[in-house]
């Protein structure tokens, strides 16, 4: 049909399909849909359909759409509104019913999993998920987990989360992590509780009392972490490992070689791919190095019997444990390959012995493998007992837990993250180029979707835990009230590049300032979320191993002109708000440039 020239000049030239791809805008398709709807209801025919189409086109010509491109749903909304305004209520009802019917059909198709395709994609390694997890090899267990994971993911997206969350994830605006598991993200546990009570308390399962010797303590730790790993998607952590294990060294009268043997057994057994999907359990151990002040006067209990000493008297035993752990990790396995787990985290406190032999061994291991994480308590108001580190980068600031009313130390080790949602920041920069107000408005929409999905997940996991789906979590944790909901960001460097048409990136002053404003905005919203929900929220520099590729691949498919890192065949986005890969090989320059940004993350970096 003919359109007035003035309207043609302002009409969109392209339209965005539901899968995110674009197609040429064709007003005749609008005319066809309206005409068929009118004929079906019997309210009007060709002439009225043309008049209504011209009204829809007029609205579109004056509309403001992200990137100047309307999506199909928005066009159909305008058609609906036009039919109602013209008093064609019967046609409008039929049109709305038609849309809803087809929406449900699309949802049903998305929920279905093509079994043959899923299995073949894995066997042929054609699915990017095959390599998305560095801890899961190509195996029968991986095939089973990959296939079942698609079913669970569709269950979350189609039957648990609100439709807007499913749409935002599928279209790559956000990434809801661990959709393939009906479980929480990561958890920290009390090693002291395990050693005092033993591995027991779950009906119908084998029980063990408190360990009396280091050998049985190591066995219970391995079994505990492996068992709990099967009830969580991510990392399982123990804190103060050297402090709590030192009494067993003293009680058994062990020499260094014996301690080293037990530590070797611990590390080897925690690197065996015994977890679902033939994965290695994702584990983290935090080492105090020097006995924390709040534990120094406390009396250890071994096998239910108090010892004739305090934790503060066991520094020599702690030193043996730390030496053994470092030497075993540095040596690697029988072929000299690095042990991936447990990831060690070391507390750097004012009394850290920098000149000791163990410190030298620690930094040699760091130089060789880059293995450990360090928690810096120098010039900090925080104390080691106030922070517990777990997972890749989830570092929990437990000052947030003071308001929970159950004491700081008692809840310190019983924390974690229930779920993670990452925002695709690169796309925001591309769609809202030079429009910071529009970018922040869309960011808010995505943050609200993230919040709502995390709140839903909290309710679902708590309900299933109460019903016995996670028996060991129920036994050793019981409540999720001290677990955070985590929101992360990805591709801030590419966001800046796209936002400024590549004039700036995160290394330039304007780009850095934009990154700071964005993170401050997210932090402000998260404080509001905490006040609204009564639940803990934190901002994490998401590792985004597979997510960064998924975002980039999806955006490249939608618009090949978007600025990305990597190559055409392997695009990616720079992790969180980090410097571009290869920008500098000077670690001190990198630290200086990232200092203010990294401090904005409340959940780890």
Question: Model regions: which residues?
Answer:
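Charged, amphipathic alpha-helical regulatory modules used
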Residues: 2-118, 122, 479
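A structural signal for well-ordered alpha-helices, especially hydrophobic packing surfaces
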Residues: 83, 87, 106, 454, ...
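Core structural elements
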Residues: 78-84, 288-289, 471-495
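Amphipathic, well-packed alpha-helical segments that form the structural scaffold of globular domains
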Residues: 35, 57, 451, 455, ...
